[in-house]
Amino acid sequence: MGFTEKQEALVNSSWELFKQNPSYSVLFYTIILKKAPAAKGMFSFLKDSAEVVDSPKLQAHAEKVFGMVHDSAIQLRASGEVVLGDATLGAIHIQKGVVDPHFVVVKEALLETIKEASGEKWSEELSTAWEVAYEGLASAIKKAMN
């Protein structure tokens, strides 16, 4: 079964909730560093600070990550596959030392952040929609890394 219209709608509506509150970007990176403290050095906007501090670069990167997952949902619904819009993503992830467990940490942080942003609208169905969209994106990035 492919990505459904309802799944796309769930991702779209919760993406809008995420974008409305910049504090969700800080939450996202706080969760990542709680799960994988060593990942701090992978992010230029985090490596020189003692804790996660809001900044334009942090906001831009979080919006890019969540935006790419959102775009993946649209692509999965339209064509059943995710094609990276940025051909350098594989090389960037290699350069930063990203390995499979990092993708799991980011997925968990993404889902926890969307759960917080969605509030009472959170459901297993919503979680699954984001998870499938993220897995599509992660798979495309991993493919570009090889």
Swiss-Prot record:
Positions contributing to heme b binding: S44, K64, H93, K96
Entry similarity comment: Belongs to the plant globin family.
Name by which UniProt lists this protein: Leghemoglobin Lb120-34
Superkingdom to which the source organism belongs: Eukaryota
Principal location listed in the UniProt entry: cytoplasm
Tissue: Root nodules.
A GO CC term attached to the entry: cytosol
Segments forming domain Globin: 2-146
Pfam family, one: Globin
UniProt modified residues of type Phosphoserine: S44
Residues the record lists as binding O2: H61
Inducing stimuli: Strongly reduced levels in boron-deficient nodules. Inhibited by abscisic acid (ABA) in parallel with lower nitrogen fixation in nodules.
Modification after translation (UniProt): Nitrated in effective nodules and particularly in hypoxic conditions; this mechanism may play a protective role in the symbiosis by buffering toxic peroxynitrite NO(2)(-). Nitration level decrease during nodule senescence.
MF GO annotations: heme binding; metal ion binding; oxygen binding; oxygen carrier activity
Keyword presence, Cytoplasm: yes
Keyword NAD: no
Nitrated tyrosine sites (modified residues): Y24, Y29, Y134
Function: Leghemoglobin that reversibly binds oxygen O(2) through a pentacoordinated heme iron. In root nodules, facilitates the diffusion of oxygen to the bacteroids while preventing the bacterial nitrogenase from being inactivated by buffering dioxygen, nitric oxide and carbon monoxide, and promoting the formation of reactive oxygen species (ROS, e.g. H(2)O(2)). This role is essential for symbiotic nitrogen fixation (SNF).
InterPro entries tied to this protein: Globin, Globin-like_sf, Globin/Proto, Leghaemoglobin-like, Leghaemoglobin_Fe_BS
